[in-house]
Amino acid sequence: VAALGLVHVPEGRRIFPRLTVEENLEIGAYLENDRKVIQERKEQVYQLFPRLYERRQQKGGTLSGGEQQMLAIGRALMQNPRILLMDEPSMGLAPVLVDFIFEIVQKLNQEGRTILLVEQNARLALQVAHRGYVLATGEIILYGPARELAENPEVQKAYLGEG
């Protein structure tokens, strides 16, 4: 699936705690054999997340939750995915880091990547999404343009704490 351009950023980050930041990133490029391409991708990740560059020799397990989320996203980007599946990227993060992660999601999308975002923070998800789907007990109950969903009274009451 990764070879087809579909890469997953899992819920709970699932980094390799005993490997360094740099080693975690390199594992993300496991399908790439060209060391120059791998280095270029690492540099792109470090530009997106300068904190990871500062911590590149640090073990992944010693990073904060926000840094681990950056690493999980960076590892996925090492595959140069066309479609990025992100599962609960804001889970367990401080509000300032949640905002930063969502800024990165928007930036990646603006650069041409398709992002499928599963997120319980409906307000932020609808702010960055083009389209939204509301699920209840595994069934799609509402869908449409994100702005329309954000303005829907049912969605506002049930998921956005309004009304």
Where are these regions (language model features)?
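Helical segment within the ABC ATPase nucleotide-binding domain
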Residues: 98-111
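Conserved catalytic motifs of ABC-family nucleotide-binding domains
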Residues: 80
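Short, glycine/charged-rich "phosphate-handling" switch motifs in NTP-dependent
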Residues: 131, 143
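Catalytic Walker B motif of ABC-type/P-loop ATPase nucleotide-binding domains
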Residues: 84-88
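ABC ATPase C-loop
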Residues: 76-77
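ABC-type ATPase nucleotide-binding domains, specifically the catalytic core motifs of the NBD
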Residues: 21-40, 48-53, 57, 144, ...
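Conserved ABC ATPase signature
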Residues: 59-63, 67
